[in-house]
Structures are given as C-alpha cells and as structure tokens.
C-alpha cells in the first residue's frame, strides 16, 4: 500500500470493545500506516483531541462512532483556525449512522477505515443554529425528534434504527403536532407540523429520507415539513407519492428562521436543543471530508 500521512481516530467510548476494529487498525499499522487512537469519555473530549491532532500534524481526524460523534468532531474541526486543518474521516459505529450511510461510507470496518485515511478530501457544508450549535447532517423537529430523544438506550442497542419506529408506535396516542412559523429565502409557512426536517444531509431517525434532495456542497439547506392535526392520518398520508401529498411542504434556502408560541425541540445530529426561536444557516465549504468517489450527496 502507498504511504499515507498520519491519522488520529477519535473513538466513542462505547466502541472500545470492538475487536474487528482493533484488528483492522493493527493490520493497517502493519502495512505502514500511522494511526493514533484516542477514546472519548465525556463531552469536550473530541475538541481536545482535535487540538492534539493538529499538534501531531496528522492529515485526517477520524470520527469513530455515530452521528453524535461525527457532529462533535466536525464541529471542533470547523472551529480551528490557520493552515493545515485536518480533513474529517468517518468510521460508522453508532446506532443509526444516518450521515455515514447517506454519503456512502462502507459498512465494512476495514474498507471504511481505508476510505477515512486515503479517500479524496472534498469541501462540504455544515449548518449552525443560533450562531452556536452546529450540525453536519440534519435538524429534526416534532414527532420524530421526541421519538429519537425518548427511545431507551437499551432498545436502541438491541434493535438499532427499528427501535425508533417501535417506540413511536407505542407513544402515538400522546403526541401532538407543533404549531410554528418558518421563513427562508422566498419561503414562508405557518401551521401545525408533525415532523420538520432541515437537512444538509438526507436522512435521519435510522434511515428515514426526510430531505431526499439535499446535497452537502451546494450552499443550501433543504426543508421538509409533514403537516397534520392528527398523528395517525398524517402518517398514513406520507405513504402517498410526494406529488399527490398535501401534507408535505418543501423549501430550500441558505437559512431558515423558526418561531413557535411554545417550546419545541430540535434534534441536531442526535443532540436535543429546545427553544421558541431558531435561526439556522448554512456554512458553505466549512470543512473537508474524505468521501467515496460515487457519493450521491455531491453536486
């Protein structure tokens, strides 16, 4: 194998007992690759490890975990200043792995690891909420957010993405739509939202294609709203094609403002953020990410 610059893997603490991963890393090290490994224990570790990675002079920081780990590492990378900022590599090890799946990261650990180290680094967008919190994949609100936030960890560990659907069916009788107003470039809507998806990426909640037209390097956010006064009829209506579905509202903009008369919660790559006012904007070409050549989310 050709010689490649060093990488630093930031591994979610839940994945430390992954024997196939350990074997894949050892094999690549035997082939001559320099791979540093750091394990997260608490929030803030990823940012510290990214700073360490810069001091080590590595070419890539690999996020080993789910969407939340990718979010933490990518957020730390875009906050770096100066030259020589490492690219982002992705090693999907989470429950749903929505971002990794949608951009075409291989499921096989050895192939994903090689891509993370040797893949082509492409400039991609990120999004920022209220000038503070960032997301690389999607912000979701409404029914879907409450389900992903409330689904028990043991259920997620046992069933993966299917756990969200099961928990949602169990909670259906207690959930109500969120009333809100959303504005963007040439866009304005007000009403009851069952689900809100604002995507840099395309899917969330364990494989649900909420924003099927989203691209990660077009400088735009894709918006999709599933409307409805009652949960079950609205869910049934989503089985129709988009063209015939009056319960689906779509838009595209470099920013969206959301206001609600009551507190609502958005899920940002797995992390909840509650409030009544949200300003969400795209950050064009915010970082470089190592992606497969056939990635469907590139223009």
From Swiss-Prot:
Mg(2+) binds at residues 215, 218, 220. The active site is at 271 (proton acceptor). Its main location: cytoplasm. The keyword Iron does not apply. Residues 2-133 form the DAGKc domain. One of its GO terms (biological process) is phospholipid biosynthetic process. GO terms for cellular component: cytoplasm; plasma membrane. ATP binds at residues 40, 66-72, 95. One of its GO terms (molecular function) is lipid kinase activity. It is found in: Cytoplasm. Its EC number is 2.7.1.-. It is an enzyme of class 2 (transferase). InterPro entries: ATP-NAD_kinase_N, Diacylglycerol/lipid_kinase, Diacylglycerol_kinase_cat_dom, Lip_kinase_YegS, Lipid_Phosphate_FormReg, NAD/diacylglycerol_kinase_sf, YegS/DAGK_C. Binds 1 Mg(2+) ion per subunit. Ca(2+) may be able to substitute. Probably phosphorylates lipids; the in vivo substrate is unknown. HAMAP family: YegS. NCBIfam families: lip_kinase_YegS, PRK13054.1, YegS/Rv2252/BmrU family lipid kinase. Belongs to the diacylglycerol/lipid kinase family. YegS lipid kinase subfamily. This is Probable lipid kinase YegS. It comes from Shigella sonnei (strain Ss046). The gene is yegS.
């Amino acid at each position: 194998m050709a010689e490649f610059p060093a990488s630093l893997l930031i591994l979610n603490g839940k994945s430390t007992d992954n024997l196939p991963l350990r074997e894949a890393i050892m094999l690549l090290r035997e082939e001559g690759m320099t791979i540093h490994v750091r394990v997260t224990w608490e929030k803030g570790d990823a940012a510290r490890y990214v700073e360490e990675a810069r001091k080590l002079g590595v070419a890539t920081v690999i996020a080993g975990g789910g969407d939340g780990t990718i979010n933490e590492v990518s957020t730390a990378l875009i906050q770096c200043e100066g030259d020589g900022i490492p690219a982002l590599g992705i090693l999907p090890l989470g429950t749903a792995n929505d971002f990794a799946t949608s951009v075409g990261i291989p499921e096989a650990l050895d192939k994903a690891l090689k891509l993370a180290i040797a893949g082509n680094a492409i400039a991609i967008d990120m999004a920022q909420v209220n000038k503070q919190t960032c997301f690389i994949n999607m912000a979701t609100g409404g029914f879907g957010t409450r389900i992903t936030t409330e689904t028990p960890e043991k259920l997620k560990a046992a069933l993966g993405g299917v756990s969200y659907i099961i928990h949602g069916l169990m909670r259906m009788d207690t959930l109500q739509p969120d009333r809100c107003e959303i504005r963007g470039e040439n866009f304005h809507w007000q009403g009851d939202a069952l689900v809100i998806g604002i995507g840099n990426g395309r899917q969330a909640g364990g494989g649900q294609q909420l924003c099927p037209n989203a691209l990660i390097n077009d400088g735009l956010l894709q918006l999709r709203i599933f409307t409805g006064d009652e949960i079950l009829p609205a869910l049934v209506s989503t089985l129709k094609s988009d063209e015939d579905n009056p319960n689906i509202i779509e838009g595209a903009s470099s920013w969206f403002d959301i206001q609600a008369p009551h507190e609502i919660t958005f899920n940002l790559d797995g992390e909840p953020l509650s409030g009544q006012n949200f300003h969400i904007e795209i950050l064009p070409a915010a970082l470089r990410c190592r992606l497969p050549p056939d990635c469907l989310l590139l223009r």
